[in-house]
Amino acid sequence: MSEQALSTFDRAREALDKKTRYVQDFPEKGVLFEDLTPVLGDAESFVAVVDAMAEAAEKLNAEIIGGLDARGFLLGSAVAYKLGLGVLAIRKKGKLPPPVVTQEYELEYGTAALELPSEGIDIAGKNIVLIDDVLATGGTLGAARKLIESCDGHVSGYVLAIEVPGLGGRDNLGDRPVIVVRDPQ
C-alpha cells in the first residue's frame, strides 16, 4: 500500500478510535454496541472515514456504490459522490413502492428481506461495491450480494468502517474482497 493510502487509512482509524461511542448491553445484555453516530456527526472524522472507504472502493473497480439501509446510505452516498459514481440504495422490505426485487435472509430469530426497484435502474454487468458501517455476521451483506446478482449485477467487493470480531461475518461473504477501515485482524 502506498504512503498516501496508509495516511488515509490511518486518519480514518484515528477518527473511528476517537469518536466511536461504546454502549454496553445494547441491543441486548452482553453486547458492546459501537455507535458511529458521533463519527458521522463530526466533519473531520466523517471526511477521514469517507476518504478511506472511497479509496478502497476505487481499488475494487466500483462502477456503482451499493449502500445498505440505513447507515450504509450515509457512507455509500458520500463515497459515491467523492468518486463521481451513482449510488444504489438497498432497502429493507416494505420501504419501496412496487415493483421490487426481494431477497430474504435468516436472522437469529426469524427472517428479514432486502429490496431493490425492479424498474428504473440498470445494474446488469456493472461492478458494485457494497458499503455499510459494520460487518457483524455478514447476513445482510450476503443477502445484498444475492439480490444484486439476481439482477445480473456483479459485487466486486465490500467496504466497511468497522468489524465485530468473532461473529464470522467474512465467512458469509463468499470469495469477494472485504476491506474494513478499522480491521480487527
Swiss-Prot record:
Gene Ontology MF terms: adenine binding; adenine phosphoribosyltransferase activity; AMP binding
InterPro entries: Ade_phspho_trans, PRibTrfase_dom, PRTase-like, UPRTase/APRTase
Any matching Pfam family: Pribosyltran
Annotated S-S bridges: none
Reactions catalysed, as given in the entry: AMP + diphosphate = 5-phospho-alpha-D-ribose 1-diphosphate + adenine
A cellular component annotation (GO) from this entry: cytoplasm
Primary localization: cytoplasm
Pathway the protein contributes to: Purine metabolism; AMP biosynthesis via salvage pathway; AMP from adenine: step 1/1
Plastid is among the record's keywords: no
EC numbers: 2.4.2.7
Lipid biosynthesis among keywords: no
Subcellular location: Cytoplasm
Biological process, per Gene Ontology: adenine salvage; AMP salvage; purine ribonucleoside salvage
Assembly and oligomerization: Homodimer.
Family statement drawn from the similarity comment of this UniProt entry: Belongs to the purine/pyrimidine phosphoribosyltransferase family.
Role of this protein: Catalyzes a salvage reaction resulting in the formation of AMP, that is energically less costly than de novo synthesis.
Name this protein carries in UniProt: Adenine phosphoribosyltransferase
